[in-house]
Amino acid sequence: DEYGKSDIGKNKTIIVEYSSPNIAKPFHIGHLRTTLIGKALYDIYKYLGYNTIGINHLGDYGTQFGKMIEGYKRWGQEYNIEDNPIEELTKIYVRINELCKSDESVLEDCRENFKKLEEGDKYCVELWKKFRDLSLKEFYRIYDLLDVKFDSLNGEAFYSDKTDEVIEILEKTGKLIESNGAKIIDLEDKKMPPCIICKSNGSTIYATRDLAAILCRARTYDFDKCLYV
């Protein structure tokens, strides 16, 4: 039982981020791959004496939730999301997405919903929590079968109120420039497209929240290494 055990990780902290499914969407083979590889790495590092932190960085925020909220407002009573959350929420998302393609005003309503969610609108927040809780219930049915556990479920939403500092740091260091009302980082010297940090309507994107996550984790865990699986 002790074969391969070591203390080479003594007094060192490592973060392993794995699984990270999207709320209100199916848990697919890609999520299964990162879940199993991440669990293996988590167990190995723990066996080597590291203070190992397993994080499930849930995809629980973003403009898609503006669409989910709009779809639920329009047709929620037609779907049984309580008994079959992922399948029914997916149907709502597909339906509202199709409508957005043909009607720009609906897409604008969805964007406004997400803006309200960011600002803490009670109705939007309550719906978001409902989608998240129902999705997690389904995800944990799978995690329990695989004997997978996490130390943190802090996803994108957790960092949504921590992005102002990221923007402030980037502005102070001269890395942000304005483009068509949005705030971006120019990555032309890296031969990459620009990275949007703040949209013209003031909303943040995944990259903004990911930077906030890195900053928060560094302060919380003072980690030596962070693995993204």
Where are these regions (language model features)?
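NTP-dependent nucleotidyl-transfer catalytic core
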Residues: 1-229
